[in-house]
Amino acid sequence: WELPAIDPDDDGAADYAGPLLSDIDFGAFSHSALVRIADEVCLQMHLLNLSFVLAVSKRAGDDKELATSICTRQLTGIAGVAAERISRALGLSADLDGLATVLRLHPLLNPAGYVAADVNDGRLRVWRSAAHDDGAWISLCSPGSLRPLQAIATAIDPHLKVEITGTDSVWTAEFQHCDTPAEDYPEVQVAKVSGGARFDFQPRRSLPLTVL
């Protein structure tokens, strides 16, 4: 798939042209450019993850089960932290509506042109896509692998429980309210120790740089 083109007539900067600055001023870009930047970040993130998968697979050798287990643990930790950060940043409600918004924006289902999925009526439907062919994050979720999606649900509301039906690459996840709250998985607890999990973007003025 191809990323959408930036509208040069949209208000704000449409590219990186101009003086060399000390930092990126996101507020200077047009809406169209910011959408493209977000898509590029999602793409870069998935490329980094695929490099992680290749490295783990090389170290695991013939033990594919071990490699899958390690990659799933990594996803579970990141999934829970990312869901919590998205929800907090957007001030979303701790219910199915808030969960639906988080899922649509979550790295697990993005870039949207890469992962075939639909979120509606408290359900997440997934079909086989290029992401499955590449062994990306979504390929680690299935009826037999609930933890990444449960980590997302728990981050929004500990009373939400996920059930998945279908095959390894074509499945439906349903989220329902339960009486007993779930606790964060150990993978999520470990991920929260990272300083990156607590990082917040702050408005900063970009200063011009002079190359000598």
What is each residue range found by the language model?
Residues 1-123, 132-148, 154-212:
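N-terminal accessory segment detector
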Residues 126:
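Phosphate-moiety recognition in structured ligand-binding domains
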